[in-house]
Amino acid sequence: MYPKAYIDYLVEFHATRDYFECHEILEEYWKEDPPKKRKRYWVGFIQLAVALYHHRRQNTAGAKRLMANSIRILQAEHRAVEDLGLDHGRLLELMQSVYEQIETVSAYKSIILPIKDEKLEEACRIECRKKKYTWGQPSALSNIFLIDKHRLRDRTDVIREREKEIERRKKSRD
């Protein structure tokens, strides 16, 4: 019914609060489609997670820019958001509220996305239980790896993929 990547995103979003991982999960899924067939709403959800990542790190400028972009994209994707089991109106209200918190440099607070499809939420809760996560748990603000994951993660795979892409481009030019 829903893509596994989307359920994984929601689980990370609401249980571990690992917004960096949310971004990784959905970006990888989004890139599975050919460039001209990629869905904008996935970008909106990716940017929502990254905006919260920056907000939690007190990067106000980055959080504000990404949240504004996310709102703009998801505002235009009413049908897709609803088809993904969320309440579009409540989602936009929530995002606008977070945007205002960012704008006034208020402290980060964990949020719960307005899931209206009970079966979707149950699927997420089941996945949480399998992983021994707690659904709806607030962000662990003392977890430095969670807060600064972009700097502390192992980048070996990322570097290797970039090198492969450079080689592919060189070969395609020859």
UniProtKB/Swiss-Prot annotation:
This is Uncharacterized protein YpuF. Pfam families: DUF309. The gene is ypuF. It comes from Bacillus subtilis (strain 168). It comes from the Bacteria. PANTHER family: EXPRESSED PROTEIN.
